[in-house]
Every structure is written in C-alpha cells, then in structure tokens.
UniProtKB/Swiss-Prot annotation:
Part of the 30S ribosomal subunit. This is Small ribosomal subunit protein uS15c. One of its GO terms (cellular component) is chloroplast. Belongs to the universal ribosomal protein uS15 family. Keywords: Chloroplast, Plastid, Ribonucleoprotein, Ribosomal protein. It is found in: Plastid, Chloroplast.
C-alpha cells in the first residue's frame, strides 16, 4: 500500500498508533510486501516462514477485534479488502 493511501491516513489520524486496527493495517502492509517478494524469490523459505508468522499474528488480532467490537471489525476488513474470519 502506498504511504499516502486514504486507508493509511484515516487509520493513523483517527486511531492511536497502537490500536488493534492500526496494528492489523501494518501487518497487512507487511503481508503484501512479503507476498510480492515471494513472487520474485520463490525459494526464500525464511521469508515464507516469516509470512506465516505475520499471518498468524494478524489472525489473532482479527479474532480479538471481532469478539470485542464487531462493527469496527467489519469496517476494517471492508477498508483493507481482506476476507473475514471463518465462523465455526
């Protein structure tokens, strides 16, 4: 995501930097950058492991946010264009 994107400015200006939403945004940004890196370097297994760790951390934060504040969770996944969690 570019540094001047509207999603970035709305999350950084509205919310505290340490809020769950901004953490999820930054993890999503790192995931997109690592995904692009892995498209170029398919055998970079340490980066693949790092990507899986970041995905797990983002998933845990999304679960936390969905339990604590469902409307903010739905708004965030809409802004970031990511899939929601699977409901069991």
């Amino acid at each position: 995501m570019p540094k001047n994107s509207p999603i970035r400015s709305s999350l950084i200006l509205k919310e505290r930097r340490r809020s769950v939403e901004s953490q999820i945004y930054h993890l999503t940004d790192r995931i997109l950058r690592l995904t692009h890196h892995l498209e170029l370097h398919r055998r970079d297994y340490s980066s693949q492991r790092g990507l899986w760790q970041i995905l797990g951390k983002r998933k845990r934060l999304l679960v936390y946010l969905s339990k604590r504040n469902r409307p903010r969770y739905e708004d965030l996944i809409g802004q970031l264009s990511i899939r929601g969690l699977k409901i069991r």
